[in-house]
Amino acid sequence: QECKCHGTSGSCQFKTCWYVTPDFRAVSTLMRDKLQRAVFVNSRNKNSGAFHPRLNKKRLQRELVYFEKSPDFCEKDPRVDSLGTQGRVCNKTSQQMDNCASLCCGRGHNVLMQTRRERCNCRFHWCC
C-alpha cells in the first residue's frame, strides 16, 4: 500500500492510499521459497480429489501442496516432452541450475578444453 498526503503547504489534511503490486523480485523469492517447502499430500481417493493430510491443516493453508511427484527430468521422457539432460553443457563452477551436479544427475561429466585463436584488430599506440 502506498499513500500520499494532500493539504496546504505539505500538511496531511487528506490522505489518499492505494494498493500496489509488490516488487517482482520479492514475489519470485517468496514463490521459490514456497516451492522448496511444498508439502506432498497423499490422496487416498484420487477419483473424488478428497484427501486426508497427516499434517496440521493450519500449516497447509499457507503452503503449496502437491499430490503427484515430478517426473525425472534427467532422463528422456516423451510423455512429458522432456529431452533429458544428457549431452548438455554444464558449468563446473556455477552455483545455479546449470552446474554439473544438477545437469549430469550423478552420471559424471567430461571436461572439454578448447583453445581459440581470433583476430582482435588491436593496435599499439605509443603515447609518451
From Swiss-Prot:
It is found in: Secreted, Extracellular space, Extracellular matrix. InterPro entries: Wnt (IPR005817), Wnt_C (IPR043158), Wnt_CS (IPR018161). This is Protein Wnt-10. GO terms for biological process: canonical Wnt signaling pathway; cell fate commitment; neuron differentiation. It comes from the Eukaryota. Palmitoleoylation is required for efficient binding to frizzled receptors. Depalmitoleoylation leads to Wnt signaling pathway inhibition. Ligand for members of the frizzled family of seven transmembrane receptors. Probable developmental protein. May be a signaling molecule which affects the development of discrete regions of tissues. Is likely to signal over only few cell diameters. In embryo, in dorsal hindbrain; in adults, in brain. It comes from Xenopus laevis. The lineage of its organism: Eukaryota, Metazoa, Chordata, Craniata, Vertebrata. The keyword Lipoprotein applies. Keywords: Developmental protein, Disulfide bond, Extracellular matrix, Glycoprotein, Lipoprotein, Secreted, Wnt signaling pathway. Disulfide bonds join 3-17, 5-12, 74-105, 90-100, 127-128. Glycans are attached at residue 91. Belongs to the Wnt family. Its main location: secreted. The keyword Glycoprotein applies. One of its GO terms (molecular function) is cytokine activity. One of its GO terms (cellular component) is extracellular space.
